[in-house]
């Protein structure tokens, strides 16, 4: 064991050494660094197994982003910053859909399987619009219902038959219409209009013929018998002379040997012939 005097001498020296070990040596302050455009360097402090970093003594210099800029102070923006917004703002703007005007939205009548429904700025309300199913939807819907398929085929065939009958009737009517070029092609509308005009012309023609027959001469009635007139004396004398001349011009019949009346008339003629030169 040391004497008490030696212990008294050793005591202050040990306490001084302990204080020197415990007290940190003052480190020289680093010179101020010029401001650079890059981010400030931060001194990394290792973790000692704990989730929060250990507290440093007040004398150790530490650069912190929170203490470097006081709250409430806005950073001055340069011309480049004002002309070109940050990438963060561009990303946020890209996610939101741009607002379109009324005429840029899809038309409500063009809705189909591949085109979505009309936007909120549609012209007509969506409750009044009925979307027509496409051919694919009809095929899928009717594939499991054979009755509807058969009914549709029957309806289509009946419609084709009706259309053929209508076309045939128009063709027959076209043959009855007189046109200047006989082989002139006419539409159904023109055929109907020409048929109406032609029918009106025929009606007027029949009326004119009936009016002409009504205004013509009277039909022939029963014939009247001719009236017999009594001839005068002069007419009688003329007729007698004509009869005598006709009798003279006729030849006399031959006389019979038995003394027929023809033989008795013969001497009379001879006497007349004999007397005739004397009369002259």
Swiss-Prot record:
It comes from the Eukaryota. Residues 25-40 have a biased composition (Pro residues). Residues 150-202 form the bHLH domain. Residues 257-267 have a biased composition (Low complexity). Keywords: Chromosomal rearrangement, DNA-binding, Nucleus, Phosphoprotein, Proto-oncogene, Transcription, Transcription regulation. It is found in: Nucleus. Pfam families: HLH. One of its GO terms (biological process) is blood vessel maturation. Residues 229-245 have a biased composition (Basic and acidic residues). Residues 1-60, 214-280 are annotated as: Disordered. SUPFAM superfamilies: HLH, helix-loop-helix DNA-binding domain (SSF47459). The modification Phosphoserine is found at residues 260, 276. Gene3D superfamilies: Helix-loop-helix DNA-binding domain. Its main location: nucleus. One of its GO terms (molecular function) is DNA-binding transcription factor activity, RNA polymerase II-specific. GO terms for cellular component: chromatin; nucleoplasm. It is linked to A chromosomal aberration involving LYL1 may be a cause of a form of T-cell acute lymphoblastic leukemia (T-ALL). Translocation t(7;19)(q35;p13) with TCRB. Efficient DNA binding requires dimerization with another bHLH protein. PANTHER family: PROTEIN LYL-1 (PTHR13864:SF6), T-CELL ACUTE LYMPHOCYTIC LEUKEMIA/STEM CELL LEUKEMIA-RELATED (PTHR13864). This is Protein lyl-1. It comes from Homo sapiens (Human).
């Amino acid at each position: 064991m040391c004497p008490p005097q030696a212990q008294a001498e050793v005591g202050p020296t040990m306490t001084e050494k302990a204080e020197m070990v415990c007290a940190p040596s003052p480190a020289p302050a680093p010179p101020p660094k010029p401001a650079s455009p890059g981010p400030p360097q931060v001194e990394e402090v290792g973790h000692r197994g704990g989730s929060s970093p250990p507290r440093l003594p007040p004398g150790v210099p530490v650069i912190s982003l929170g203490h470097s800029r006081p709250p409430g102070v806005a950073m001055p923006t340069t011309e480049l910053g004002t002309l070109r917004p940050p990438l963060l703002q561009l990303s946020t703007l890209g996610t939101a859909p741009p607002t379109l005007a009324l005429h840029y939205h899809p038309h409500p009548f063009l809705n189909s399987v591949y085109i979505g429904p009309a936007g909120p700025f549609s012209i007509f309300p969506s409750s009044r619009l009925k979307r027509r199913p496409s051919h694919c939807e009809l095929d899928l819907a009717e594939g499991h219902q054979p009755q509807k398929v058969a009914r549709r085929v029957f309806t289509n065939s009946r419609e084709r038959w009706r259309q053929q009958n209508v076309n045939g009737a128009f063709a027959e009517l076209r043959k009855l219409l007189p046109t200047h070029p006989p082989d002139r092609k006419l539409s159904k509308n023109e055929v109907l209009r020409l048929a109406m005009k032609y029918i009106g012309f025929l009606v007027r023609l029949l009326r004119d013929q009936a009016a002409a027959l009504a205004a013509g001469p009277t039909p022939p009635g029963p014939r009247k018998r001719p009236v017999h007139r009594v001839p005068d004396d002069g007419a009688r004398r003329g007729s007698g002379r004509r009869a005598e001349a006709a009798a003279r011009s006729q030849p006399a019949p031959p006389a019979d040997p038995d003394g027929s009346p023809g033989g008795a008339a013969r001497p009379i003629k001879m006497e007349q012939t004999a007397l005739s030169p004397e009369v002259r």
